[in-house]
Structure formats: structure tokens, C-alpha cells
Amino acid sequence: MTFSVKAMPFLPSDEPARDSYIKNPMLWADVPDPDVICVDGYFYMVSTTMHFMPGTPIMRSKDLKNWETIGYVYSRLTDSPKYDLQNGTVYGRGQWATSLKYHNGKFYVLFAPNESGAMGDTYIYSADDPAKEWTLVSRMRHFHDASLFFDDDGRVYVVYGTGNMCELKPDLSGVVEGSDMKIFEREADERGLLEGSRMLKHNGRYYLLMISHVWAPGRHRRQVCYRSDNIRGPYEKQVILQSDYGGFPYVGQGTIVDSKDGDWYAVIFQDRGAVGRVPLLMPCRWIDGWPMLGDEDGHVPTWMRPIAKEEKKVSIVSSDDFNEPKLGLYWQWNHNPIDEAWSLTERKGFLRLKTNRVVSNLYEAPNTLTQRMTGPTCSASAFIDFSHLKDGDCAGMAAFNGHSGVLTISKAGKQWQLSMSEQVVSLTDREKSIKEVEQEVKETVQLTQRSVWLRIDGDFRVNQDFATFYYSYDGKEWFRIGTRYKMRFDYRKLFTGTRYALFCYSTKNRGGYVDIDNFEFGDIPQSSIPLVYEQENTGSNYSFPAMPSVSQLPVIRELPDPLTMRFEQKGKVKKGQEGQRITRFADWERRRNEIAAAIQHYGIGVKPAVAKENVKARMVKDTLVVDVTVNGETLTLKSKIQYPKTGRPPYALMIGTSGISLPRKLFDDRPIATMVFSEAQVNDYSQWRKHKERGEYNFDRLYPELKDNGAYSEWAWGLSRLIDGLQLLGEEETKIDCCHIGVTGCSYAGKMALFCGAFDERIALTIAQEPGGGGAAAWRMSHPLDSVENLEKTDYHWFLESMRENFSGDNVYRMPYDHHELVAMVCPRALLLLGNPDYKWLADEAMLPSAIAAREVWARFGIEDRMDYSIVGGHPHCQLPESQYPITQAFIDKFLLGKETEE
């Protein structure tokens, strides 16, 4: 028999309606080992939180979408000093896989800490109201991943381990002697334990849901079901779910639940990397007496119809102003707290954390307060007044796990400082004692006042798991500090998802404290940094610094730091790289102008500015015509605009340098116009056809004093004049949105696109396809490589002849800039670099480190999503492979159309 289920996956057609639908994951947070029941129209869920206190959280929802924590089964566990971080720890242990049941008007939970000895006892608690106090009913021997089951005849059972079962006494005080039995055996191809037992009864049959792993090729983590007409067996087996989802691994372990309307649902968790193990929601359809999970094809659906009308939007995570006399239920302590060492009342509106015990590191520190981090992205910040810390005290905020990224306020001599460090704990296998904490400080800044805002952003999208770290003196202007930290989930360490953690501990003497306020939890703040500008060159606000002679330039063998100012006002280079390092975006304009000056002076020649009154523009049908008059000479540029067949004007625009090499299909279904910049109208140099010589081009009629220029400065100048024309005419006449202009090209035209994007800040998106040496590849990196386009082997019609004279051979290390800084000039706008390693001449070996170094500029300002690179072979030169379609489409959609995607 097939049961009809209303909650089938369904993608609503009208966008606003999506808010009422449930999108998987049901909760993008660490909520492993879920058990769910439905009582009086509410769903109740329990999960594993291990060493965090209070423990065994009870969550409630009316609609399976909005969940809130309504209480905990216990406030602390006291069987061992390990729970107090004394004589060891219980990291990765404590409360595991809990069974939640409702029977005869009472709620019951059963769980067993995954530990040997007394701490391994199984606990059974009960409550009349799950939001209020729970009472310990009994303790008995250890049952691994057990399911409590009340049968219709009044008998009570525990199913545990891999097919083990025993009967409990009616009052749940212990095991009925002689009742232990094996109800099924594991199959030969199944490895490890079958875990996560969930027993239920439906239509007179017994069903046991478990997770299974198999060795066979092509087989994965899966959810299986055993069923029998008799609780003691024999049981038959069926795979009821074998599905991955959303680019993450296969799904398994959880339960099924029926609503008051008779519909059935499954809540099964999925490993999602550093965020932890997250619950997914899916239909459960009874087919031939089996609870089959997922959609009709057996896959986890993205969308589910609403289960019930939502009462209110609630969450298991939250901001907190600490104005209440009790901590919110979204907070948990790492191990048992020391109650006298924290307060919400000693300073009204603040959480006070006091040092109480001298410890060596964060993992030993008591009273670390935590909340789950959430996906796909999240951000949390807090104000910390550290004016009462003592020498040797450490306080701050962490992305806390076995591998942690940590912001620590500490004292160095008489100066307070903030450091960002990466910390990794090593634990003994049995006792979970701390063997070692490896700590690597990535950056330290001196603090200029005795209070600071700290912020950590988390990105848990596919293949991400990154945390970024910030500090602020006013909560408004944020400064990036440290690395973009790769978070990790490691079952051998904490076995939990990464959490936000607030901490304060002492390494010398007790008695110091911090006051914390305004914990703000939400999504990553929308950057206030512009994506595009109306002005061609914001650096025109600054005069170019004087450039030193080549003999004055120091040897710099590594890639120069793109964020460090390099030239003194008098024109002398400071020794090494001892200039001011940019930390604020407000200073980037000045540094970017310095890079532009160096590239023009030593590399390509001057790109001259043009007064608006010297540019005239008109539309001739669909062709843009621009006249530029300088020194009594006029140069005319023409470019036909190809308008899209979809959408409404004004349209985004993609300009192809010498043509558009990207596949036409990337634009056919998008409301994006295209046009081609024919560079020969400015400078007709070509490697493949007859051309004029340097000083004879159309550009040189306007600027005879710049006859030594390289082609890339002149071509960049020409494309900018087309944008001048679009701005002059306006969107009503051109049908073009000048705030969403992109530029792209491949090979030599990929270089051209990169120079155009770098030198015109009105270009929102630059896609440089296979730009090769002289493009994104740093000259320093290509110099030692064989058979690549390096500084000696490039085409010098593109560059100043003096560049070859000045920087050939090992003199390349005297170059005061490199092409990673050309790449960085595109920041804060969007850039995608596409490489092809099959063509060695392109020097992708040099482009990769150049791209990585340049991306640090975007990262410094917290906008690294605006820059990426993809190097993929197996295709002809300048023919984009399908494997690069997704990232290219994502950049086009986001930065030309303003659409966020899963990419």
C-alpha cells in the first residue's frame, strides 16, 4: 500500500512564496543523532551535544521549519572531575545519541555517554513538561546508540548496538534478567557498527531504522530498515535511503515521525564538514509496508511543502544583549561551568567572565560560552571591555573546535594586543586528556583602547569551511586580522560542529575579568565596499609618486606585498618592504594609485585621462559611435551593441576585447547585452597581420608625446572611451546599465581585458581567459620557467621597450611591482581568472601563485567572494570547457545580474 503524503518536494513558482516553504537542510547547524516525536500538534526533537552544558537539548517546532530550544534534560553531569576539565576532559564524549519517547502522558529520554566505567552508564529521565524540570528515573549498564521502545502490551524494551535488544522492568529501574537477545546479524559487506537505532511500531509491525556502511564499490552511507511481525524477529531488511545531497556526502541516521494529520516525515542527518552534522527533512512514503524516504526517485528534496502554518519565527541560535537575568537557552558551556566565575548581574546588561583557574590554553579553560555556527554563512560579533584583565590573562572569541581559529586579547609588557591564531588540540584516546595544543599566531595588532569589538564570519558552503576574523573600535569600521582559516570537523578530537566561543582565562594569576555585551548573530554583513564606481580612476584624487631610477630599486626576489606602500613622497624606495601596510579599505585607493603609477612608468606607458568635454557620443541604430578630440585631432570609435532577447532594459553589458571568446550560450538566456571593442581603431598592432609601427597609430595622432607607449595602455584607454560614450548618452538612449559592465577576452585579448579592468573602475566584472605571461602571471614567477612567455620572450609591442632594457634577466627582481599587483588593481571589483595548463606557453605555473597572492587583497577587506581563479586543462586554447561553465556563470549572474547562486 502506498500512503499519500502532502509534504512532497515542490519548488514554488512564485518567489515570495518560498519563505513559507522548508528548504533543506532543515537546520544548517550541528544537530546530530536526531530523534523526533509529535505530541499534541508539536514536534519535539532531541540531539547530541556531548561535552557542552547544559545537556540533552529539547527543541520544539510547530511546522518543522522554525525550531527553538525549550529546555535541557540536565544542567551538568557530575560523575567525574573530567566534566569539570579536571584530570582529563570529556571532549567528544558526554551525552550521545538520545532516544526521545512519549508514553502515558510523560516524556522520556534515554542516553549513554560514550565512556567506560561509571560515566558510561545509561541514563533514563522523564518529564511531564519537556520545557521544565526533568527527573532522573534510573541508571543502568551502557547501551550504545539505543532506542527506548514502549510496546502496546505495556512491555518496555531497549534496542541498541548492532541488533541487540533487552527488556526493561515496567518501572524502568533495570533490565529484566535473561532478556538479552540478538534480533538480527550484520551482513558480511557491512563494516563497523550498524548505529543509530530507532524503533517504532506501525500497523502492527515493528520497524527498526539504522545507519549502515558497506565495503562494496559504489556503495555509501545509507539508511536501512529492519521489520518484523514479532519484536523478537525474524527481521527482514530494506535499504530505505541511499542519497547524497547538495554537494555533500551521503545521508544517514535519524528517524521517521507521523504528524497529527497522518502524514509521515523523515529527519536524517548529513555530515557537512566543519559546521557539523545537520538534519535534513524529507517525505516518508509507505510502499509495500516499507517506509521509503526521499522523493519519488529516492533522493533528498530541496524543498518541502509547509507542514503547518508557522506561529512565529524562532531559532536555536540568537543574538544576546545580556539584559536578562538568565542565559538564553541557545548558549551552552564547554564542560561544566564554574558558577561563581560568571555573572549577568554584577554589571547590568553585560556578561562578566572571570578568571578562576590558572590554565595553559583555551582547551583547559573553564567557562567558555558557546553557540552553534550555522550555514550556509554566518557572522557573530561581540563588544568586549577588557579593562580589568591582568597580566597573563587571555580573553576573546573563537571559532571553536578541535581545530580552532582564535582571537585573543592579551598583554605584552605594558601594551595590550589582539592576535589571531590557529590552534589544534591533541587528546589521548582513552582519557581524552590534553596532550598538546599547537598554536600558530598569524597576526598581532596593538590595541589603542581598552575595549574592542570582535567578529568572526563563517562560510560553510560546499568546499568552503572558512572563517574570517575582524576587530573594530566602534562596531562600524572593521579591520581584517589573520588568515582566512580553514575550519575542520574531526571525530578524533571534539566530534562536534564548530561553535562561536567567548572565553576568559588566566595563565598566571586569578582575578581578572571581562565584560561582554551586544553579541550579534546573523548572516555575513553585506559589504559596504562598492562593487563598481562611476569614476574611471578614483586614484586621480592623488598625484603619482615620483618613480626612482632602476639603479635605486632594491632586489626583491619574492612577490612584493600588494598591500604595502612602496614609495616615499620624495621618490625613494624604502629598504625592502618596510613601508606602511594597508589595513583599511579607505587607504586602498592610495595604494592602488601607487601600483598604477609603477605599472605605467616601468611597464606599459601612460594611460592619459580625457576631459568629458573632449568626448562626444551618439547612437546610429544599434551602434555606439564615440568621437574623442585631443590636441586638435579626433579619433572615432564604433561598436555595435547586440541586445538580448530576454529581460527589459536597461541591460547589463559584456564587452569583448577583440571579440567575445566565452560561449554564446552563457549569454543567450540572460538579459545581458554584448559588444566588441575593436582595438585596431586605437592601435592596429597585430601579431598576425600587417600593422603600423609604434608612434604611427591613431592614438599617437592625439598623443604624439606618448609614442613610446605599449599597446595595452592605449587599448585600455580606447575601451574606457566607449564607456565614456555610454555614460554620456545614458540608459534611455543606449539601453545599457552602466553600473553593470563586464569585460572579457582570451589570450592576448585576455591580457587586454585584465589591463582594461584594472585601469577602469567603472567595470564591475573582469573575466580574463587564458591571459598567459604578461597578463596575470607574475614576471618573477615565470622567469625561471622554461618554454613560457616570460619578460624576455613577450611581445614588446604590448609594453614599453624600456621594460626589456631595465628588467631582463635577473633584473626582473628589481621590478618594483609585479603582475599580481596588476591583478589586485581590480579590487574591490569582481575578477575571474581562467587558465589552461595544457598550453605551457601561458605560464599558468606563474599565474597560480600570482592569483593567490592577489586574492589576499580582496580577503583583507572581507570581499574574497569577488575574486576567484580556475585552471582546467583538456580543451583547446580559448574554448571554455563545460567544467568551467558553473564558476563563469556564477560570476556573471552575481556581478552583472545581482543574483546569488549556490556556486
Regions found by a protein language model. Name each.
Residues 768-822, 843, 847-851, 859-864:
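Mobile cap/lid helix-loop segments that gate and shape the active-site cleft of serine hydrolases
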Residues 745-749, 753:
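Gly/Ala-rich beta-loop-alpha elbow adjacent to hydrolase catalytic centers
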Residues 382, 852-903:
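C-terminal catalytic histidine-bearing segment of alpha/beta-hydrolase fold enzymes
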Residues 656-732, 738-739, 772-775, 779-781:
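Cap/lid segment of the alpha/beta-hydrolase catalytic domain
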Residues 827-829, 833-844:
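Conserved strand-to-loop "acid loop" that flanks and positions the catalytic carboxylate
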Residues 561, 567-649, 661:
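Non-catalytic accessory segments flanking enzyme active sites
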Residues 1-531:
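Carbohydrate-active catalytic/glycan-binding domains of CAZyme proteins
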Residues 1-22, 291-312, 529-605, 903:
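N-terminal pre-domain segments of enzymes
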